[in-house]
């Protein structure tokens, strides 16, 4: 009696092709995933800048339409200062952790006062400007 032997399985070429396809899919998916993380961090910075902007507007209402001076917008003056806090919960820096501070680094803001108005700029990765208020 003869036994018929059937080899079932994948060849080396087939396995290599599958590995190459998985590598190509990973090369496409990983940068897209990292880009989504940056978008989420930028959205956090935008929300934080908006909260600080509202705090500055509240400060101006309480001080005869006078905005705080350049370099004076911080957690110490807008939240922890004497009297009513102008920002209930100071925004966090999504890039470095901790509180958002004035400066050009990622996740921070820059506040500039002109004679009639102010400019508040939020910074993303590498210090790039991602939002300007108002």
Predicted features, each with a name:
Residues 16-32:
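Alpha-helical hydrophobic helix detector
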Residues 57, 61-119:
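Extracellular/periplasmic head regions of type IV pilus-like filament subunits
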Residues 40-65:
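Membrane-proximal N-terminal amphipathic helix
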Residues 1-10:
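N-terminal leader/signal peptides at the extreme start of proteins
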């Amino acid at each position: 009696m003869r036994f018929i032997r059937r080899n079932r399985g994948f060849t080396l070429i087939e396995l290599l092709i599958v590995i190459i396809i998985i590598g190509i899919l990973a090369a496409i998916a990983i940068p897209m995933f990292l880009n989504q993380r940056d978008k989420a961090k930028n959205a956090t910075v935008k929300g934080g800048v908006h909260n600080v902007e509202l705090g500055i507007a509240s400060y101006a209402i309480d001080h005869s339409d006078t905005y705080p001076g350049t370099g004076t917008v911080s957690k110490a003056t807008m939240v922890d200062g004497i009297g009513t806090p102008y920002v209930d919960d100071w925004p966090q820096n999504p890039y470095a952790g901790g509180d958002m501070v004035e400066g050009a680094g990622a996740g921070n803001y820059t506040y500039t006062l002109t004679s009639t108005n102010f400019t508040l700029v939020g910074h993303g990765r590498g210090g790039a400007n991602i939002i300007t208020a108002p």
